[in-house]
Amino acid sequence: MKEFFGFGGYQREPAGYFSWQHIVFVTCFMIVMVATAVYFGRRNRHSSDSEKNKVLIWAAILIDSFEIFKIVIMCIRGKDPMGWITELPLFLCSIQLITIPLAAFSKGRVKEAALDFVFIFGILGAVLGTYFAGQNYSCYPVLSFDNAVSAVTHSISGFASLYIVISGMESMKKKNIPITFAILLSFCVMAYTANVLIPYNYMFLMRGDGTPYDIFYNLVGGSPVFYPMVVVLLFVLYICAFWGVYTFVKKKTAERKLHANVEKTEEESAMV
């Protein structure tokens, strides 16, 4: 148990980024994530908004509870009561520690925008924070406290994203897009400010650190000006692309349903 939590440092060697142990480990979490999202989403598809929201409330409580537990353990393990400074929810993935509770407990347009934000970024964070968490799986053994809690919290983010769309909680209204952008840009500003003051690498705005962002970091030669601008631009473009694809799929689905209903009506008329 001491070895799992990393007290005194991990004695086992990391299996490595994209090792078969890494892939099998995170894939197990992804399977559970998708299965539970489909189960609860389909079960609550035609339930009231309050019933649908209960699942999201539990997701909010669980993700924050695991994260708080992780921070406490890491502060004890590192014998540093200020260790929480480098564990602030200012990564793209960990923003869900705030936005999932916001989606669960707020009301009106703020709730709609928060639900859309979790829907848009939850699944992205789940994939990036598990399969592409190069820094974690290069530094820690696969079966370790750090990787286990990270996999759990990222899976909850992905679960919330999938559950929202499967249960029909998303709105994706044009009028709420500015609020979604405002949420994202606010976190980017806070992350960059924290990076300068601590210093740290929240939101990977300073460097790639073994993530896919390394590609863009190298493209701009590590420029402290252009690199963070590129990262933020990628976030904005992702929102636009996600919204565009969602709108297109929604439109095509509605057209197919309309066409099917017309054919059904014509068949019924012919039978009469």
Segments (PLM) and residue ranges:
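Aromatic-anchored segments of alpha-helical transmembrane domains
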Residues: I63-V72, G122-A133, L184-T193
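A glycine-rich, hydrophobic loop/mini-helix early in the fold
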Residues: E51-A104
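Hydrophobic core of alpha-helical transmembrane segments in multi-pass integral membrane proteins
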Residues: I23-G41, L62-F69, C188, V232-G244
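Membrane-proximal helix-loop-helix units in multi-pass membrane proteins
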Residues: L102-S161
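Membrane-interface transmembrane-helix boundary segments in multi-pass integral membrane proteins
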Residues: Q11-F29, I179, L185, V196-I239
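Alpha-helical transmembrane segments and their immediate interhelical/interface regions
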Residues: I68-E87, S138-M169
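Membrane-interface helix-boundary motifs at transmembrane edges
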Residues: R42-L56, F105-A114, S167-P178
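Alpha-helical transmembrane segments in multipass membrane proteins, preferentially the mid-helix core
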Residues: V34-Y39, T99-A103, I156-K175
